[in-house]
């Protein structure tokens, strides 16, 4: 497959997330919406589910965002990119959608180097893991988590290599 064919395929996938979601669901897969940037996608993947970013863009209509966000929220928050107004989004989802779906919150500690920060972080991930197990209906094993980490690390390495190569071809 040529590079241009790959780019064309990527453009279609990026422009049609609703279609991609429908394809996953048609395959019988559970899809978990994740807000950027700190969602533990590896845990979702290890559970056998698909992590799908809840993203937006400035060239998309965001009128439905007003159903979930206060009118004074900036479009950046409505489009689910990281900023101060993103912090309460999980609570907004919980209030608006909590009776329709499980909303899982993850608080990242500001200090992850002291013992108390590490303990807090470990407890937060354990809570997320337990919530995901409830959604997927089975235990997420340590082996599955390790395998998921390997998959994601390989993907990240490939993206870093792509950026390096793309930088050499700015023409």
Language-model features, listed with the residues they occupy:
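Short C-terminal domain-edge/linker segments immediately following a structured domain
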Residues: 62-68, 109-112, 135-139
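Short amphipathic alpha-helical segments, especially helix-boundary/capping motifs
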Residues: 14-19, 55, 102-106
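A charged, amphipathic alpha-helical module
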Residues: 1-30, 122, 126-171
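An N-terminal, globular interaction/scaffold subdomain
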Residues: 33, 38-91
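Short, well-ordered coil/turn elements that cap or connect secondary structure elements
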Residues: 27, 46, 98-100
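Gly/lys/ser-thr-rich phosphate-binding loops in alpha/beta enzymes
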Residues: 70-127, 131
């Amino acid at each position: 497959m040529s590079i241009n064919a790959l780019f064309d395929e990527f453009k279609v996938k990026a422009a049609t997330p609703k279609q991609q979601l429908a394809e996953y669901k048609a395959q019988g897969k559970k899809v978990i919406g994740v807000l950027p940037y700190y969602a533990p996608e590896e845990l979702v993947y290890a559970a056998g589910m698909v992590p799908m970013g809840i993203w937006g863009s400035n060239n998309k209509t965001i009128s439905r965002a007003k159903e979930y966000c206060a009118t004074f929220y900036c479009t950046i928050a409505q489009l689910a990119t990281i900023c101060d107004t993103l912090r309460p989004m999980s609570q907004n989802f919980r209030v608006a959608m909590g009776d329709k779906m499980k909303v899982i919150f993850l608080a990242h500690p500001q200090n992850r180097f002291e013992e108390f920060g590490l303990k807090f972080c470990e407890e937060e991930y354990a809570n997320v893991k337990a919530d995901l197990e409830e959604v997927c209906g089975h235990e997420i094993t340590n082996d599955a988590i390790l395998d998921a980490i390997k998959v994601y690390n390989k993907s990240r390495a490939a993206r870093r290599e792509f950026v390096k190569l793309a930088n050499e071809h700015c023409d």
